[in-house]
Amino acid sequence: MTLATRYFAEQVLRKRPNLSLEICRVVIENPLRISPQEDGRIRYWGWATLQNEAEPRILRVITLEDGTTIHNAFPDRNFREDAP
């Protein structure tokens, strides 16, 4: 079972209806890159095909410190695989 913060459930999914918990979970389980934030949250980047889209995109998923509770997610147009 994938958990989500109230913010994700009430705000993010409303603003980005092409996202889902399942899509975010796939990114967390198969990341291209993982990076901790100063506040303890964890950023994951990975390929995901969003609902109603034909081509995969890079999605950034931010979890709480536990690494499983999803707090935010969005397509990241600025991601570069060769960047640190």
Protein language model features and the residues they cover:
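Ribonuclease/tRNase effector modules and their secretory precursors
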Residues: M1-P84
